[in-house]
């Protein structure tokens, strides 16, 4: 539902479909003239879990998606600290694992998990999931890397 956030160069790229002022929770394949090859998601004040199913349905087979996981919007109110900042490593681990497992349950494969080198405006550590739509879910072995990735993020950014 947001608008005015997309970089000007991307906004003017003919390969990019700009969908401002659109509630992505309702995404359906018929929103697109052809199934997208790629999706990126950076949402606030809503869980990515509410949008992932629509992205999965809309992407073409073989497509990829990069999802920015913001723990402050995934953890639940009881686990978010002062000023909306999540600092707890265990909360980060659980949020990344829960989101990755949800992506797997949706049908995505997990190609890679990493932390964002850029923190959110209030200093929140955020994480990236590279997902694939390949017809068969896979990538559960990547889940074992989550504790190490969270530790690296805290070492670099906390």
Ranges and model annotations:
Residues 2-50:
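S-adenosyl-L-methionine
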Residues 71-88:
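Short, glycine-/aromatic-enriched active-site segment of Class I SAM-dependent methyltransferases
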Residues 6, 70, 123:
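Residue-level signal for inorganic ion chemistry
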Residues 29, 53-56, 121-134:
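Short, electropositive alpha-helical surface patch
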Residues 49-66:
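A short glycine-rich, Lys/Arg-flanked "PGG" loop and its adjoining helix->strand segment in the class I
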Residues 92-106:
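Short alpha-helix
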Residues 107-119:
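Conserved S-adenosyl-L-methionine
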Residues 125-158:
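Flexible, glycine-/basic-rich loop-and-beta segments that form/coincide
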């Amino acid at each position: 539902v947001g608008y005015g956030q997309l970089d000007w160069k991307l906004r003017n790229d003919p390969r990019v479909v700009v969908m401002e002022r659109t509630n992505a929770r309702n995404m359906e394949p018929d929103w697109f003239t052809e199934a997208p090859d790629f999706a990126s998601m950076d949402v606030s004040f809503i869980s990515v879990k509410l949008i992932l199913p629509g992205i999965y349905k809309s992407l073409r087979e073989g497509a990829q998606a990069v999802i920015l996981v913001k723990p402050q919007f995934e953890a639940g109110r009881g686990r978010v600290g002062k000023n909306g900042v999540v600092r707890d490593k265990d909360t980060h681990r659980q949020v990344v694992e829960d989101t990755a497992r949800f992506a797997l349950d949706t049908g995505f494969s997990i190609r890679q998990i990493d932390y964002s080198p850029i923190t959110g405006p209030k200093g929140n550590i955020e994480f990236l999931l590279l997902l694939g739509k390949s017809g068969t879910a896979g990538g559960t072995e990547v889940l074992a890397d989550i504790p190490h990735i969270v530790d690296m993020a805290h070492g670099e950014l906390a």
